[in-house]
Amino acid sequence: MAGNTIGQLFRVTTFGESHGLALGCIVDGVPPGIPLTEADLQHDLDRRRPGTSRYTTQRREPDQVKILSGVFEGVTTGTSIGLLIENTDQRSQDYGAIKDLFRPGHADYTYEQKYGLRDYRGGGRSSARETAMRVAAGAIAKKYLAAKFGIVIRGCLTQMGDIPLAIKDWNQVEQNPFFCPDPDKIDALDELMRGLKKEGDSIGAKVTVVADGVPPGLGEPVFDRLDADIAHALMSINAVKGVEIGDGFEVVKLRGSENRDEITKDGFQSNHAGGILGGISSGQQIVANIALKPTSSITVPGHTINRFGEEVEMITKGRHDPCVGIRAVPIAEAMLAIVLMDHFMRQRAQNGDVTTTIPRW
């Protein structure tokens, strides 16, 4: 499996499976001298971890991260940072009955076609359990970007099913189990989730992630455009089926006179582009949206085949999220942070001495 690393100068490599002994990652490219403790990483891990509310999977993993290397006397040394999270609440017996079945909508069929075998316990490497390490690595990037440049990265749920959620109050996001920025919609979300749990079904969601304080100039045209790398990173998250930068697919409704972000001496007059022009950050707020499919791990009977080609009906057992979009919020934040950190390192390496007289806002 060659696709376990993201980034060029700030590089994150993850390993581990859903029901294996542990998850881990190696983070390369972290500058020396950054104060860093396990507590710095734990906050975002606690936001992502399972079993924290009745709306998410009841698999109870403490997700206590251990820093194995790269930190000495409380500061980074500039060498590889090794991180580890032990799995403690596996129930592999829940999956014994499906070892010869291909769960519809999951990676079972494609993994076995590619490798000739698969770890059927909770999806193995294809499980979203792997994203715990992305969140841990992303927390390092978030801390550096905030301390060095004042960049703030945050995300929220902006749609669940057919319920749109307006970004009314960022302070509300951490005050409810849905990462919802619209306090007027909490009851509707609660009602939807209760109904789904009763039916044994699931629902899709939309997550918005933004970065404020990003200076202009980040991005490497043409193939490593900033928006291209952000889209790549976000699309690599489990269950993501679509990525938008800025207005995304809504731009098809606009005319050029409406969509262009006009500039005056006071700055940009709009941000349809989502803070990126020509693959390079403009200094405006970076905005990205992701669409997450409803999980296929549901108790509604479905049709599939077994490895012998026989048609069977199956119900997925185990502990699963009725809406995977909820816990995707800190994951999306982490992936955006990893990409921005990598591009900061690349910009500093090539263009660190570049200065301009063009206004910045």
UniProtKB/Swiss-Prot annotation:
It catalyses: 5-O-(1-carboxyvinyl)-3-phosphoshikimate = chorismate + phosphate. The keyword Lyase applies. The keyword Lyase applies. One of its GO terms (biological process) is chorismate biosynthetic process. InterPro entries: Chorismate_synth, Chorismate_synth_AroC_sf, Chorismate_synthase_CS. This is Chorismate synthase. NADP(+) binds at R48, R54. FMN binds at R125, S126, S127, N238, A239, G278, K293, P294, T295, S296, S297, R319. Pathway: Metabolic intermediate biosynthesis; chorismate biosynthesis; chorismate from D-erythrose 4-phosphate and phosphoenolpyruvate: step 7/7. Its EC number is 4.2.3.5. Its cofactor is FMNH2. This reaction introduces a second double bond into the aromatic ring system. Homotetramer. GO terms for molecular function: chorismate synthase activity; FMN binding. GO terms for cellular component: cytosol.
